[in-house]
Amino acid sequence: MATNEPEHEHRDEEEAGANEDEDTGAQVAPIVRLEEVAVTTGEEDEDAVLDLKSKLYRFDKDANQWKERGAGTVKFLKHKNTGKIRLVMRQSKTLKICANHFVKSGMSVQEHVGNEKSCVWHARDFADGELKDELFCIRFASIENCKTFMQKFKEVAESEEEKEESKDAADTAGLLEKLTVEETKTEEKTEAKAVETAKTEVKAEEKKESEAEKSGEAKKTEESGPST
């Protein structure tokens, strides 16, 4: 005669099966260990002197129209050692470089016609890995940010111009000093040569006089004849 198992035994078996699926708390080591990799941006030796969100455009000469370069943050970065300042802009999501060039003497920036939030400038840009002449237009969220950008741009360009003028003045002073030293040395050599020539002439004259005296004495001796 078959007997039915008690209901509580079924419950015990179900609970035991459930317990087997429970987390035991044991830690499982990952099959592949990923190491942290230091990410470098090339900006480690520079300090940001300006940092503004913006959208950048470049003028496509072939299509004769403005094309968006990217939206992100534009920075003026000052090198800690050389003091040179470059303009760098990266796309906010991909961090791809949109613009990368030094701000140099003679560069200028001006407001984009009809839009006080935008400004334009020419630059020799290196964003694509090679120098290219680019015409950029940058747009900001506010007029104030645009003015701040333009003011900083002009300050940097003027500062570079002053540095070049100072360097040119120093180079000119150094050249003049070198020329003065060379002229002095030339004059000294000329004077020394003149003195040496005078000495040589004096010696030659003295030699002639000495020879003349000797010749005169010899002639007198011949004229007087032998003594008797």
From Swiss-Prot:
Tissue-wise expression: Ubiquitous. Preferentially expressed in root tips and gynoecium.
Ranges of compositional bias, category Basic and acidic residues: 1-13, 179-228
Coiled coil: none
Gene Ontology terms: cellular component: cytosol; extracellular region; nuclear pore
Subcellular localization: Nucleus, Nuclear pore complex
Region (Disordered): 1-30, 159-228
Stretches with biased composition (Acidic residues): 14-24
UniProt-listed Pfam families: Ran_BP1 (PF00638)
Record note on quaternary structure: Interacts with the GTP-bound form of RAN1, RAN2 and RAN3.
Full protein name: Ran-binding protein 1 homolog a
Lineage: Eukaryota, Viridiplantae, Streptophyta, Embryophyta, Tracheophyta
Gene name as annotated: RANBP1A
